[in-house]
């Protein structure tokens, strides 16, 4: 069992990583006998894990209600969020309740925002079931729903009480979802840790076949890196923005193509290559390193070009709504070398459009 702490003073919390955690009531600390829980999951995951998690909590004396939501990025919306509020109010659940997010990034983000909002804030626990949510979205307290004009535009910074990563969940993960998660894994190596990037080049095949020790190390290292960044910059005033490598371009793809048509990691993968191309055009990143990135993403089964349905010009309206924009000026996360990156303002639209054009599907 691996345990990492996100250090945020009174709001510090553990990330527990191991196989078989759904069998252990102690995995779900700080829950205790007599506590009230609303377990939030989706239609795909409910048949796989709902009864198991409910059972282990009830054996510990926890009172469990549940709400099952539709599955997909397109349901990460205010309308579906209201479904959670209605379920909480009908019981009713008070300020002493705990929301448990059992799912991937959509469930985690939406449930976290529900917890931040319901009665001005209740406790919640992240139980991520996808690789993407285990290495990234469950850690750090970013919660949100989407708006038709932009991804994650309505939300709050709100930290969980704990994160429970059961590696056994990956056994039921579709190959496309596994690849999507690997985009965020690869991102960490590019922005923060050259040695980890090299390790990924050497061990990607083991990750693709869900080798237990390799996957445990991979998730632990990503969570360590994320925890360090969040502890230093919880509200994304500086360092934490580096975690958005590829996301300014990727969010544009998701919004333009319709949420769910491109998985988040797929859009981020294409966006990472666009960011690398932009950095190349600015003379601060080598084409050889871009090729290393492309090769690793392709081996993971990820796209390295944007959708053919989008022109370069289609990206800009979405990118200009990005949360990093200041005074109407684009600010991009750009790689400087493998393991090193920066947030840069003043990147011209010409450079951005050229980088996108370099990555358009034929």
Swiss-Prot record:
Protein name: 3-dehydroquinate synthase
Organism whose genome encodes this protein: Salmonella schwarzengrund (strain CVM19633)
Gene for this chain: aroB
Binding of NAD(+), residues: 71-76, 105-109, 129-130, 142, 151, 169-172
InterPro entries with a match to the protein in the record: Dehydroquinate_synthase (IPR050071), DHQ_synth_AroB (IPR016037), DHQ_synth_fam (IPR030963), DHQS/DOIS_N (IPR030960), DHQS_C (IPR056179)
Residues annotated for Zn(2+) binding in this entry: 184, 247, 264
Function: Catalyzes the conversion of 3-deoxy-D-arabino-heptulosonate 7-phosphate (DAHP) to dehydroquinate (DHQ).
Family per similarity comment: Belongs to the sugar phosphate cyclases superfamily. Dehydroquinate synthase family.
Lineage: Bacteria, Pseudomonadati, Pseudomonadota, Gammaproteobacteria, Enterobacterales
Enzyme class: lyase
Required cofactor(s): Co(2+); Zn(2+); NAD(+)
Keyword Isomerase annotated: no
Record keywords, A-Z: Amino-acid biosynthesis, Aromatic amino acid biosynthesis, Cobalt, Cytoplasm, Lyase, Metal-binding, NAD, Nucleotide-binding, Zinc
